[in-house]
Amino acid sequence: MSRETAVVVGVTGAFGEVIAKRLLWRGLDVVGVARDAAKLEEVAGRLGQEFIPCAADIGDDGAIAAIASALPDQAVAMVVHSVGLPVAGGILVAEPGALAAATNLKCGGFVRLVRAVDTRLRDKSRLVAIGGHYGFEPSPYAATAGVGNAALANLVRQMSWAYGPRKITAHLVAPGPADTDRLRKVAAARAERAGKPLDEEYENMRADSAIGAFTTPDQVAWAIAMLLDPEADALAGSTMGLDSGRRHGI
């Protein structure tokens, strides 16, 4: 059986390396994309020769050619858009331009990624974007995550309809809040506004879960790897909510 490729954008982030490791375990070669070439080489040293580093800024159109040129001469089974956003604060203090920047990274970046691999996609290839809880449950403390991830949910549905005739499926994975450095920055903004200690606010956020837990990177990687199964066709265009029981809406 010939080898195939997965492309993971944001591979040096909180989720990216864990996802890449899981996809390598599933037998795929992985092209890992990030801006920082030095950090990419560190990841490559940990993941081995089936990991192919690609230094590119997914917020810029030049990433399309950079990713395309890094692809091995084989089919692309999956792309994963796992780009993180800088914390810009709540909606009362965030710079207006930060909202546009978030949309460029989340939505523009996903479009660039898919266009880079379009000619290598095959039947049942998976186009996966990582959104987040705040795209569905708005918080005044997470302006960029809320706006960027809400827009991404719409884009994934558009991708689903656009690529469906080719039997290629698009998926949104919406974790969180996840136990990462970024979440601590969100908690710090909430704590400052509420006049509470950071640790107290962090535990309050944990208690928002029905099971008193934050989502972990390993759980996100598990869900994404599951989408490689042929049965995942049934999830075309849908959102996998990995929020550890936080959502209240029906």
Feature map (PLM): residue ranges:
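Conserved glycine-rich cofactor-binding loop
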Residues: 12-13
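Rossmann-fold cofactor-recognition segment
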Residues: 47-62
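Amphipathic alpha-helical dimer-interface segment in Rossmann-like NAD(P)H-dependent oxidoreductases
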Residues: 69-73, 104-125, 160-161, 229
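Conserved NAD(P)H cofactor-binding loop of Rossmann-fold oxidoreductase domains
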Residues: 82-88, 245
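Catalytic Tyr-X3-Lys loop
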Residues: 85, 92-112, 128, 145, ...
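Catalytic loop of short-chain dehydrogenase/reductase
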Residues: 126-165, 176-178
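Short, small/polar-rich loop/turn modules that mediate ligand/substrate recognition or access, typified
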Residues: 164, 169, 235-237
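Short C-terminal tail/terminal secondary-structure segment
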Residues: 231-250
